[in-house]
């Protein structure tokens, strides 16, 4: 966890400084903390398409394909 004091009641830390600059450098966003949700969702979606594709390929070429 971060040692920064939260300004919000739900524990979030603001992502911008008062002067408008990002609070965290762009390089640190990829090397610290949790993975971005869009990256996790993209990888999960690709995995689902791959597995479903394997089922269709197996039905076309495998046992029971006539």
UniProtKB/Swiss-Prot annotation:
It is a single-pass membrane protein. Keywords: Membrane, Photosynthesis, Photosystem II, Reaction center, Thylakoid, Transmembrane, Transmembrane helix. It comes from the Bacteria. It is found in: Cellular thylakoid membrane. One of its GO terms (cellular component) is photosystem II reaction center. Pfam families: PsbJ. The chain crosses the membrane at residues 37-57. One of its GO terms (biological process) is photosynthesis. Residues 1-20 are annotated as: Disordered. SUPFAM superfamilies: Photosystem II reaction center protein J, PsbJ. Its main location: membrane. InterPro entries: PSII_PsbJ, PSII_PsbJ_sf. PSII is composed of 1 copy each of membrane proteins PsbA, PsbB, PsbC, PsbD, PsbE, PsbF, PsbH, PsbI, PsbJ, PsbK, PsbL, PsbM, PsbT, PsbX, PsbY, PsbZ, Psb30/Ycf12, peripheral proteins PsbO, CyanoQ (PsbQ), PsbU, PsbV and a large number of cofactors. It forms dimeric complexes. Belongs to the PsbJ family. One of the components of the core complex of photosystem II (PSII). PSII is a light-driven water:plastoquinone oxidoreductase that uses light energy to abstract electrons from H(2)O, generating O(2) and a proton gradient subsequently used for ATP formation. It consists of a core antenna complex that captures photons, and an electron transfer chain that converts photonic excitation into a charge separation. This is Photosystem II reaction center protein J.
């Amino acid at each position: 966890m971060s040692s920064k004091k939260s300004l919000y009641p739900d524990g979030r830390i603001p992502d911008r400084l008062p002067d408008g600059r990002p609070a965290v450098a762009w390089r640190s966003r990829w090397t610290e903390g949790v993975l971005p949700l869009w990256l996790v969702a993209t990888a999960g979606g690709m995995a689902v398409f791959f597995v479903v594709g394997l089922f269709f390929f197996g039905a076309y070429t495998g046992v029971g394909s006539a």
